[in-house]
């Protein structure tokens, strides 16, 4: 599996549109509570927001979208809510995967799905197989996922593959075993719902990601909210350890070369 460029080892290519957007979809419960509805109603409406975000990402030329659907810590929630979330996850898989495939979307799940009901695991595997050849958008769902778990499982795989690596290993040795090893590191991280933390999501991959926090509750997140996040991203100066002067000089050199090419 070819590794994508590391932001701590080199300078990834960047553009006005983020190639990879990662989202923590927070605020479903509060959205429901404000409307005197059960929490599951917020999660159900949240699925609609996911569908709209996928469409908006495709229209804007985003190539990778990763959402945090269920963390390894979410098992601590009330048992009844977890049960309803699992039912909603299964229903969404049954209803959405065919549409994703018809729209050229590659679907996959990262995380320890062995903890889920076998029926969910079966639908996940079927969906991944069905959409494996698609490339219009790479849509990844993190389920029973945690950033620390991801790093630990990568280290275990690395040592199993090469026991000597336990003593002599480098960043790429771990990186190639991470859950998103074949995807570019996220350019833009979005968290809805007003909280300002990353909650054990993609700890390795977010090293140089631009972070964007919004008070918008996830069920209310739409194309215009995505555009606001991208507009904020465009204003950022992505230095990757460099100074502003270095970036300005690099841009000046690019402009000079471009002008010379026109002559």
Swiss-Prot record:
GO terms for biological process: polyprenol biosynthetic process. Its cofactor is Mg(2+). The keyword Electron transport does not apply. InterPro entries: UPP_synth-like, UPP_synth-like_CS, UPP_synth-like_sf. The active site is at residues 26, 74. GO terms for cellular component: cytosol. Residues 241-263 are annotated as: Disordered. Pfam families: Prenyltransf. Substrate binds at residues 27-31, 39, 43, 71-73, 75, 77, 191, 197-199. Residues 243-263 have a biased composition (Polar residues). One of its GO terms (molecular function) is magnesium ion binding. Keywords: Magnesium, Metal-binding, Transferase. It comes from the Bacteria. Binds 2 magnesium ions per subunit. PROSITE patterns: UPP_SYNTHASE (PS01066). Its EC number is 2.5.1.-. Coiled coil: none annotated. Mg(2+) binds at residues 26, 210. HAMAP family: ISPT (MF_01139). Belongs to the UPP synthase family. Homodimer. Catalyzes the condensation of isopentenyl diphosphate (IPP) with allylic pyrophosphates generating different type of terpenoids. This is Isoprenyl transferase. It comes from Nitrosomonas europaea (strain ATCC 19718 / CIP 103999 / KCTC 2705 / NBRC 14298). The lineage of its organism: Bacteria, Pseudomonadati, Pseudomonadota, Betaproteobacteria, Nitrosomonadales. The gene is uppS.
């Amino acid at each position: 599996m070819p590794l994508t460029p590391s932001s701590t080892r080199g300078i990834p290519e960047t553009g006005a549109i983020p190639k990879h957007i990662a989202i923590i979809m927070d605020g479903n419960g509060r959205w429901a509570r404000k409307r005197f509805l059960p929490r599951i109603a917020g999660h159900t409406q949240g699925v609609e927001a996911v569908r709209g975000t996928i469409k908006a990402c495709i229209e804007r030329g985003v190539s990778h979208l990763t959402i945090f659907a269920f963390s390894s810590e979410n098992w601590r929630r009330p048992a009844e809510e977890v049960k309803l979330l699992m039912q909603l996850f299964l229903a969404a898989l049954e209803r959405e995967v065919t549409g994703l495939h018809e729209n050229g979307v590659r679907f996959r799940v990262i995380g320890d799905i062995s903890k889920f009901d076998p029926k969910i695991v079966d639908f996940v595997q079927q969906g991944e197989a069905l959409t494996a050849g698609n490339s219009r958008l790479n849509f990844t769902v993190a389920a029973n996922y945690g950033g620390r778990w991801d790093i630990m499982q990568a280290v275990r795989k690395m040592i199993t593959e090469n026991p000597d690596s336990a003593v002599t290993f480098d960043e790429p040795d771990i990186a190639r075993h991470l859950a998103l090893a074949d995807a570019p590191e996220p350019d833009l991280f979005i968290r809805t719902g007003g909280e300002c933390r990353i909650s054990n999501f993609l700890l390795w991959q977010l090293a140089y990601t631009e972070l964007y926090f919004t008070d918008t509750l996830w069920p209310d997140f739409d194309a215009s909210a995505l555009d606001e996040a991208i507009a904020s991203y465009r204003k950022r100066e992505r230095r990757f350890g460099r100074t502003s002067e270095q970036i300005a000089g690099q841009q000046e050199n690019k402009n000079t070369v471009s002008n010379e090419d026109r002559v």
